[in-house]
Amino acid sequence: MTIAVGRAPQRGWFDVLDDWLKRDRFVFVGWSGILLLPTAYLAIGGWLTGTTFVTSWYTHGIASSYLEGCNFLTAAVSTPADAMGHSLLLLWGPEAQGDFVRWCQLGGLWAFVALHGAFALIGFMLRQFEIARLVGIRPYNAIAFSGPIAVFVSVFLMYPLGQSSWFFAPSFGVAAIFRFLLFLQGFHNWTLNPFHMMGVAGILGGALLCAIHGATVENTLFEDGEQANTFKAFEPTQEEETYSMVTANRFWSQIFGIAFSNKRWLHFFMLFVPVMGLWTSSIGIIGLALNLRAYDFVSQEIRAAEDPEFETFYTKNILLNEGLRAWMAPADQPHENFVFPEEVLPRGNAL
């Protein structure tokens, strides 16, 4: 009797690599990790290096590092000089010509952090897609994370691409972001933009929904433990519900006259509201990149100019924006050598 034993199929390098990447370990790597881990490491490392050592004297005329006396709130990795335009500012490019110190002085670290940070965020979203597929769940976490990605890409990349250079993007720092917000208000009247309004409604609405949902669940927990602390009565693998949806529905029906009766609709709504807020604000930022105007109530401006007794909150805000532009531009863009004659500077209600 003859027994034929077949040869084991040869495993290619791709299969071996796939198995290694998806191996069960403390920190999952996966195919997405090939993009996420190095880019996140370089982006964070670049930011720490810039805020610790690199000055902004040559790009913004200011100090921006711990080495120069800044603290955590005032240190930043500043945007490149306006003269750099939209150059990628590669270390080996024509601007720095391989000189690392010159590259830092020109703002090369900002481009480095921005581009690697964008790819790191995309890698993190792909990581959520990959793990969701392996675990066998739906990919709504990854879809939700597209909101922060849209905001980052629109604010840090799309907006300056629509302007004259990377210089007009936000620098990577706390006070630097605040300066950028003031800039958006003064030069674009951003708070009156309907996309900003939708973004605020989405983010604050999401926070409100989160608070309401958490409080309602805590209010309607089943009394299933003898201890004062109800947290210890919960087991992650328990089959029964931990709170009463029926009681929660009756509670909110009495308060508003209407309430969610479907947990799936409720949680989808909690996903939808903040993510739509992030998406709409990102669309608005792209509009600002193209210098699109939102609401201009010209009739009120004309009447306010003609009638000293007529004033609205809109006309007051327009005057504030003029003040921001007039006083901010010379300090924010010293390389332009702006000089505004005193007679054109705004004087409050006196117009």
UniProtKB/Swiss-Prot annotation:
Residues at which pheophytin a binds = Q128, N141
Q: Where are the transmembrane segments?
A: 39-59, 123-139, 151-164, 206-226, 277-293
- In its UniProt entry, what is this protein called? Photosystem II D2 protein
Q: Which organism is it from?
A: Synechococcus sp. (strain CC9605)
Q: How does it sit in the membrane?
A: Multi-pass membrane protein
Q: Keyword Transport: yes or no?
A: yes
Q: Ligase among the record's keywords? A: no
Q: Which gene encodes it?
A: psbD1
Q: Which Pfam families match?
A: Photo_RC
